[in-house]
Structures are given as C-alpha cells and as structure tokens.
Design a protein with these regions (language model features):
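Short amphipathic alpha-helices and their capping/turn segments at secondary-structure boundaries
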Residues: 34-40, 73-83, 158-162
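Hydrophobic faces of well-ordered beta-strands that scaffold small-molecule active sites
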Residues: 46-48, 87-89, 168-170
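Conserved, mostly hydrophobic/aromatic
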Residues: 50, 79, 89, 137, ...
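Short, solvent-exposed turn/loop segments enriched in Gly/Ser/Thr/Pro and often Arg
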Residues: 90-97, 172-180
Length: 180
C-alpha cells in the first residue's frame, strides 16, 4: 500500500522542517468515464517535454491556475492546435524542493565565492526546481495543485489529455543504489 498524498498542502519554495508526514490513502472512486490510453505510434508522435510549474507560471501563459496541473489543462487546446500529441512531464511526484536549513549569507558573498571549487558552493543548497531527486513517487506534488487534492487534480489532467487523444508520459528520478 502506497500513500497517494500527504495531509496539508505545502507552499512551493517554502522551507519545511523534516517532520513526520501524515499519509493520505484516497479511495479508488475517481470516475475515469471509460477513459482509454490513446496508444499513439511513437513514429507519429510529436512530443513536448514540460515542467508543470514552468509551463504556466509566467503571466504570459494567460491561465487562471498558474504553475499547476489545472493550468496545464487550460493550455491543452493550444498544445493540440500546434500539433503536440504527447507531453512528457518532468517530475510531478512529491519531492522537497527546499533544503531543511537555509544558508543566510548575502547574495554578494555567494557571488564572490562562486568561482571557487569549479562553481560549486560547499555548504549551500539551492532550490530543487526540477525535482530530480528522491521523492514520494506515488503522490502527485501538492504544490502543483490549484486545489487541496493534488491526486484528484492530476487524474483530471490525465483524463483531459486522453479526451483529446493526447498521451502523457512521466519522468522519474531514482538515485543510484536505490532498490526499484
């Protein structure tokens, strides 16, 4: 049995203390309405790789729910119009995008030391915008949801893709040595 989410919706980019998470196990009562995987031929597919937050976060996207699964749903007609048949989503599972501890040095201090150690900044952790790290693979990222139920919103997005005969592919990152 795997959790499909966690109680409480975190604010994207806000540091969270490493505390026990309360898992949510939603029922399987989602109405897929006879939804079927489009099964498109790869040689006839036009793929578009996107980041949920990055695709619709800017005001120029003109969506109501910026940076969310619902925001992508608002842009599906546009994607279909330009000929996209398949969207590959960069990690959409729950992951911590911020470190537990935040370094308090000024940006001038950071810039001054950036040239040392080949550009690496020992002791600094940056925002994990992309999500390529270990995570909770069965739980859609709550910060990518416009509403409280990220699992429901993600399922609705997949269903909207399929209504347009569009496929959705998910990327996952599994750290070296992880037993998968």
């Amino acid at each position: 049995l795997h959790a499909r989410g966690f109680l409480s919706k975190p604010v994207y980019g806000k540091t969270r203390k490493n505390v026990n998470r309360i898992a949510v196990f939603p029922g399987e009562d989602f109405d897929w309405e006879q939804d079927e995987h489009p099964m498109l031929s790869y040689c006839e597919s036009v793929c578009y790789c996107m980041h949920v937050r990055g695709f619709t976060m800017h005001a120029s996207s003109k969506v109501t729910h910026r940076g969310t699964f619902a925001g992508i749903a608002e842009k599906l007609d546009y994607l279909q119009e330009i000929g996209i048949t398949t969207v590959e989503l960069q990690p959409v599972y729950e992951f911590d995008e911020t470190p537990e501890e935040v370094n308090t040095k000024t940006s001038a201090d950071i810039v001054a030391t950036a040239g040392e150690n080949g550009g690496e900044l020992p002791g600094y952790r940056v925002l994990n915008y992309w999500g390529y790290r270990e995570g909770f693979y069965y739980a859609p990222k709550a910060a990518y949801a416009a509403e409280e139920d990220a699992a429901l919103e993600f399922r609705q997005l997949v269903k909207e893709f399929h209504k347009r005969r569009m496929e959705v592919i998910l990327q996952f990152y599994f750290p070296k040595g992880m037993d998968v």
